[in-house]
């Protein structure tokens, strides 16, 4: 399920914005840690909900992993466009290009926030009510009714 992270782009982004050296594999390690955390959230949610929701949770997890990799790779490409003023120096610094880069960073950050929202979708899958437009609505309602009837019998 993990998607590739462009380590070359991550290195270039680090070199354009920092005097410290890039640690090989650190971008992939950061990505894997985030995906592992999402996978743990998904497994916890699967243990709490009916098995009919497991496929949806897996799909959301895969979407999270794919979009996160795309977002991180895009972020590295954006960061590598224009060097930091600390790296390039103030003489003939391309202010217009830097402003364009900052707008692209803002857009990339909005996308990242949306991707993090997928974790909330994973956490809430199977916890809400039954939707009338759900193709398995009758099956779900019957299962819920059976469970409520069993609870009623136990209470008697």
Where are these regions (language model features)?
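Long, charge-dense low-complexity segments
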Residues: 1-156
């Amino acid at each position: 399920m993990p998607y590739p992270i462009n380590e070359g782009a991550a290195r270039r982004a680090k070199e354009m914005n920092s005097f410290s050296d890039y640690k090989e594999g650190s971008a992939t390690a950061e990505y894997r840690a985030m995906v592992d955390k999402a996978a743990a959230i998904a497994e916890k949610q699967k243990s709490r909900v009916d098995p009919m929701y497991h496929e949806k949770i897996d799909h959301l997890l895969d979407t999270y992993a794919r979009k996160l990799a795309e977002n991180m790779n895009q972020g590295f490409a954006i960061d590598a466009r224009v060097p930091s003023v600390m790296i390039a120096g103030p003489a003939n610094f391309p202010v217009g290009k830097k402003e364009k880069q900052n707008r692209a960073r803002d857009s990339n950050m909005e996308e990242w926030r949306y991707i993090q929202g997928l974790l909330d979708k994973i956490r809430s899958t199977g916890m809400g009510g039954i939707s009338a437009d759900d193709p398995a609505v009758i099956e779900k309602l019957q299962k819920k009714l059976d469970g409520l009837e069993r609870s009623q019998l136990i209470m008697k």
